[in-house]
């Protein structure tokens, strides 16, 4: 299926001018609304907007001269009209949905623009996978822009991916329609140390006049941070404190503050605006990672904006951070992010700016959602057969594959420590018993990274603490940021083998086993990352998974996200990869048993 290009301003400029002047009728006129102008931080009561060919032609006190015989007229007295919301940084794959189904889920929440970084699928299928995501994105009735992933692998030499991304791939992608920049530059040590590959990717992006996304996951705000800023990233979403936000803005970067399914970083950073008084133009609200369950039950960008307001932010400033600031950051302020002539007619009808109930959503001048229901088709790509067969284990796994052996009576082990509601882990040590030559978890859990891209049969084993799991369980997932092999966590090695083999059977997803039976299964057949079923169906299965995790003893908030991040070898302190245990503080492999 080929996308239908949305007309450019140049294509329709004459019609927009004629409509605004009253020489040609508008397609749609909305009258008497409280129009929110984020460009001036004003609310204009009783204003009208006139729309032609999906763009705003006239925005002002009286659009009666734009009304013709066939013009659709809607009265909105007493209601606010605000720009459609923009998510400045996010990964569609985190919703475990295809671009089409993710779009269908967020439209009723008022999201009309998304800036996506498909680096999850890049690790599985490389540039081809990115293009497939991008092609489906271009089919959607809202604006789904793509940032070309920068880091596959995220940490060269510390993990192996299905495919790698390099400067030539970045240069090629910069010529695709709808590409807005380079995705988050996670290899911050590479930038700081002058990696020629990383700098070449950044240079290719800047040469194309596009935006470089950042990712500085370190508390060090000394010379390393300044070197990273000098390397070209234009934004960063990894801050967790007011100090982090201020440091980024002072270095000319935009601070992206996030509220996702597992990230709660708005409250701790927005005080840089609300209390310290820094210029809010340099702060952007984003979600980063949102599960289908969150989208179905809680919302998307509307949830994040409401949270910012609840944290003391002026509603108009919060809206700026989710509209015009984002558009300006990506050089699209002439296209999206404000209700003004020439821009795409993306807008939301709401009766209250603080609680932000989303009543009606328009995208490109068309009503796309009303009272929580998506009214438009979100077309699917015909995904190639091989993308649905991406789990290649190479052999039948048994309990013996998950053994960590020692000749001692007890050992001191390096242990990954999970921290609730935070991406960073703690590097812990724990004394563990050895029985019959096998190290036993003894109150914690085992973790394994099972290679699934090349069918090597490789299994890397270690230990993890903090989930609270009881005996006889295992959970496996092919969503294993960022290399997306397979993470298996369990307290029973036989269950770990069963869980891993089950995902090989279904082509990927998440499964939880307890006492010999499967208690939950979320099938993710596309790249082992996504389902092309509706968000409501995926969310229902995720709910079953969460209930099964709780029954197995885990009560952490959003524990699944913590599970999926245990192989993300660019976020401190301790992670696992197919090459071994990784100390992210030093970016070196470290033994499980020192």
Curated annotation (Swiss-Prot):
Which cofactors are named for this entry? Mn(2+)
Question: Manganese as a keyword?
Answer: yes
UniProt keywords, alphabetically: Hydrolase, Manganese
Gene Ontology terms for molecular function: adenine deaminase activity
In terms of CDD domains, this protein maps to: AdeC
Gene3D superfamilies in the record, alphabetically? Metal-dependent hydrolases, Urease, subunit C, domain 1
Q: Which GO terms describe its biological process?
A: adenine catabolic process
Write down the chemical reaction(s) this protein catalyses: adenine + H2O + H(+) = hypoxanthine + NH4(+)
| EC number of the protein | 3.5.4.2
PANTHER family xref list? ADENINE DEAMINASE, N-ACETYLGLUCOSAMINE-6-PHOSPHATE DEACETYLASE
Family (UniProt): Belongs to the metallo-dependent hydrolases superfamily. Adenine deaminase family.
The name on file for this protein is Adenine deaminase 1
Organism, by scientific name, is Jannaschia sp. (strain CCS1)
